């Protein structure tokens, strides 16, 4: 009869346990699942440390911009560090969720005792087995506050990862644009050398015909050598730009890199007023979102400090079995089931709780200052990038007008010179002006792309859909 009552009590306790467990898991505070993959880069997950990168290539031919981005992200140590931090924060969310569940432990033991007397020897063997369960039912909100703090820290890590991703994208695209601009500048320098060679050839031919002096030929030859010097400098600039691109991509500096053929397309960007850019940046920039998540985590830590050393209620269940046997005679066994409900009310802790709350509030103030700093820095960066983009647009338009006028003037003076009307000095001045206009136009076209990129990066809007630059497909 007693055994039946024990089993009934055990079933009743089990039912109460599972009912409370369902209420706790179903109605209590629950953390969202930890991130299983890194934050997506507009449909394509960013590479993580566990993802294998492609094997090193002997050379990179026809390297397009988006291919360069993928390669650089795969080899980026900063992104691998950020992703590892996300995984660590995700594990902390799981740790913060763990106190909502009961803990179950199984223990077993065996002991032997032998005794010798004048009447002989006897021995006793004891076998002990126990299953215990401990479950915190009430903790004055400490678990929920800790869970909110862990979730906010995970959000902060994800947003910080996004900020690092923005910086890396800007670095890669900037290096690619620099290499493409250097290639275009070299192409222009080669054409300029051919133009100067043509003028020198015409001057030599006219000198042989007695139409120009030897001094005119020397002036034309000097202009040709100046063009050759500019071509040599452009070749060196291209080599330096490709070396910088290799470093950003994370490949061997000796790897030959050939960019995809064709000119870079202009970087498209929405035409918005500065006030709109600032509003959008405050809402979207990952650095601001990371600071906001850090503030949320600090605020949750204040709740954790308040709930620490507050009243708690714990449920304990235990099922024990003890059996013993004599060396010659079986002694018997016993079973027992225990249940306890414990209330703990801290009375005095040496003012530790008050100091914890003060420290948590100070951290909130620090996070508020960091958030203000992030907003100010983002706003200043957006304002500077916006002004730079406006200036770059004006410079690009002016360089285009200069290029058209200088080319028309050169072609006019060339026709006059070939017709024997103009002199070589006029032709060389027009040629120098046109070549300068060509070089400036290449520079300002590149500057317009980089300034548009800088504005997108400052506003936190850099991504696949906003990055142009690959050559148009035929």
UniProtKB/Swiss-Prot annotation:
<dbReference type="GO" id="GO:0015562">
    <property type="term" value="F:efflux transmembrane transporter activity"/>
</dbReference>
<protein>
    <recommendedName>
        <fullName>Protein CyaE</fullName>
    </recommendedName>
</protein>
<keyword id="KW-0204">Cytolysis</keyword>
<keyword id="KW-0812">Transmembrane</keyword>
<keyword id="KW-0998">Cell outer membrane</keyword>
<dbReference type="InterPro" id="IPR028351">
    <property type="entry name" value="CyaE"/>
</dbReference>
<dbReference type="GO" id="GO:0009279">
    <property type="term" value="C:cell outer membrane"/>
</dbReference>
<keyword id="KW-0354">Hemolysis</keyword>
<comment type="function">
    <text>CyaE is necessary for transport of calmodulin-sensitive adenylate cyclase-hemolysin (cyclolysin).</text>
</comment>
<keyword id="KW-1134">Transmembrane beta strand</keyword>
<keyword id="KW-0813">Transport</keyword>
<keyword id="KW-0732">Signal</keyword>
<dbReference type="GO" id="GO:0015288">
    <property type="term" value="F:porin activity"/>
</dbReference>
<comment type="similarity">
    <text>Belongs to the outer membrane factor (OMF) (TC 1.B.17) family.</text>
</comment>
<dbReference type="GO" id="GO:1990281">
    <property type="term" value="C:efflux pump complex"/>
</dbReference>
<keyword id="KW-0472">Membrane</keyword>
<dbReference type="GO" id="GO:0031640">
    <property type="term" value="P:killing of cells of another organism"/>
</dbReference>
<feature type="signal peptide">
    <location>
        <begin position="1"/>
        <end position="31"/>
    </location>
</feature>
<dbReference type="InterPro" id="IPR003423">
    <property type="entry name" value="OMP_efflux"/>
</dbReference>
<dbReference type="Pfam" id="PF02321">
    <property type="entry name" value="OEP"/>
</dbReference>
<dbReference type="InterPro" id="IPR051906">
    <property type="entry name" value="Bacterial_OMF"/>
</dbReference>
